[in-house]
């Protein structure tokens, strides 16, 4: 596989090499990083370091990923909350903690596996063998509505709506702190964080990202917010809320690192989905209720 090149800075000085790699490379654990060093798949300034090497800053690291084991998306009988289904599309309410499609870090137990069990062969092949039917994604620790296509025509029709921003997606979240205004728009470009490849960040020259938001309710130290995506970048709402200085409650990547008791993920739920049906051309508007964890947190912060 092609090596990944990383450049360290003074801020990395004193950090163990394996810890730096695990922080910087998506889906790489610290133990896997240490093994890569032992296997000779990591070079620092062109030389093989020992596994306890500590960075001094301003090094160039070359990391060669291990060849991944083949992944085969297989049907698995996992509970599926179907909100809408016909011959062309299926919309489900994804729980927090469920990954959308197989990848090296999670080869099974995903939404794709359960869709294959539920739908059989009637999923579009446009997304490839590991993403059959998947038109868009939501993060593992985000819950709510996600649509999948049952044939290639439906997939292409829905993808076109996604591209021209007519497939409307609405989210609700709880953010830390009190937003000054009652509504607003964040128009700030997003790209991968150069310091940590697992994170996204607002970066000049990144891909355009637009989030419209409005306050639903205010609580001491928290705000219940509705967000509408105009674009759909990776981690967009999470990045934009943190950019405003109000990270989403429970988001350990862009907010406080400590998990919130009672939450399995962040308080972010895809509550609404609106699209033109690929076959009938009718407008379909769907909603789903907030998960129990979310409503329990609203009660808790209202005390």
Model-assigned labels for residue ranges:
Residues 1-185, 189-194, 293-301:
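RNA pseudouridine synthases
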Residues 44-45, 101-102, 149, 200-202, ...:
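Thr-Gly-centered strand-to-loop micro-motif
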Residues 45-50, 221-224, 259:
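Short alpha-helix capping/helix-loop boundary micro-motifs
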Residues 46, 65, 239, 257-258:
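Conserved "cap/hinge" positions at secondary-structure junctions
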Residues 50-54, 226, 265:
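Short, surface-exposed secondary-structure edge patches
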Residues 82, 175, 212-215, 248:
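Conserved hydrophobic positions within beta-strands
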Residues 128-160, 167-168, 172, 187-244, ...:
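The conserved catalytic core of RNA pseudouridine synthases
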Residues 249-262:
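Short, surface-exposed loop/helix-turn segments at secondary-structure junctions
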